[in-house]
């Protein structure tokens, strides 16, 4: 984004002149190397670009760069544990106690919980060796996006290997080796938000007749900034994390450059360099804005005298410390990049001495270097922040004006971002968008838009002020991609066989399926595929066919047509399976309890449009004195509160000094929980693995953002096993929410993350009891259909 040439060519939509970006960050006469270009493509089409490069330049002149994968906390303990003969279960338990993919270590408490003695000679040796090999090279892998292109043949200069993926080759040198040789490397990166934006803009064009691009989206829309100031940013690029949501109301962006700062300020560099609070105080008028010299005012005026970007650190070094552009570029190289700690400390003496020689006071020079030293913990270039800010604004504008198209596009671009489909669906419904379930007659592979009610009339009370901002007049129909285990090929066949050629012209018209048998005959699906569709309750349009009735109808078809098992007696003269079977007698099946419906929704769709699991548990929660999450809005700051919810997100940023941020939700609202390091170490198993938690802590409110600072956590995951016991006494129109896996999918008898459902076990042992209760022995609707075949 620093290059006017790249802007004119359309490589970037960010105008470097408008942003005043530093061209030397892109290329300079002192840098005897080609410019560093990172190009982001739609993540779904990145492979097309890679194959295009191979096709244009040939594999002998183009290849993906390599990268060295090093041992980190989990891989180190796994490798050492394996060498010492620990069992897989023990290794898994030890490694799972380490947060994420960082260079953490196993605590003594974690060792004790696995049943081992942390003081034993063997265990001490394992922990010591695992710590020592942290950061050691482990193996060579493909670089995330670095592409090498040369004029002469690559295989005459460096070794080339075949990648595991078909049609890929990579050079067996990493990017530092390539830089040393002066070989051109361009980063060809995939970005999920670009796929999302393209799909959303296509939906807006198709259903609203408005054609926009990144360059033509209306700029500086006040409604967009007002939405972001309320931290209403779920799904919005770069500002949807818990840390960014906390920062948005405090920074209160009102212009595009404010978004550039928002992207850059929540990074380890500014945080470690103590730049965040001074900037916010100056922005609010709580601290005077001052500059030690006119030269530095020109460098720092856009950020109120506080250095927030790498380019500013380079300019300060040149202007205040007398660095040459070449030395400033070496300073840039010493700054950290993602997952690589910088070595900026080696410039301390030169920079401070240079500033003293230019008349600056030592106190200011040391404070200035301390701030710049923060970039040794990963700071953001202004050019990157500007590029990302453009996507922040575009995605926020779509969310504000067309939440239906934005939600559908987010679902169709998965996996990406912080949030799973259930949270995206919940947020869309809160913004007034009607969301409809996947259906055999209405759904395609992707989620689509259908005529629906005006979203402005259905807004949740939290978003009522957006009434005049939202243009949405469509409902989102969930795509067949949401059904677990259904392939894209099968879903395309469903749509294809639904279409018939029109007799009047060459166009095609949709002929709805009218029965399970019709679906079977037209598609030729096996029983297994029909069961997947029935499990997902995708036959609702077939005469209000319920999940249980659909499974019965699928089982009633028997295995005729399941080609591998057809017997000669049931084949036609041509050898093809006969498609005519006797009609199954009609039966009246008892309705499935809504609790069981919700369980199956989560099992086969990973979300539910019927109800939130917390609704079923409310009597038990009330008995424990646990309040609904929306009560936090009425709780004064500083008061203690007791809440609960499904854990939807856990974050432990490297810049947060061990603090864990959890997001939990119940049937009423989402709550933000802060877990301090001492509490985390004491309750580590709950924080890391609980699906449903109760939280006791102190309410904190700042700039409209509410947190609960936890001092006690209780694992209530076993409560989820009670869902199947609840009948139709719950409002079936409740909002949808997410629980990652309320039931372990591979072990159907184990409910909610490993807690054994004794009711299910009892029903397996006594099928007659299951019949009396009106539920199946597997906690699903399969049992009645199996009995039909036996009878």
What spans do the regions from the language model cover?
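Noncatalytic, beta-rich nucleic-acid-contacting surfaces in large DNA/RNA-processing enzymes
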Residues: 1-791
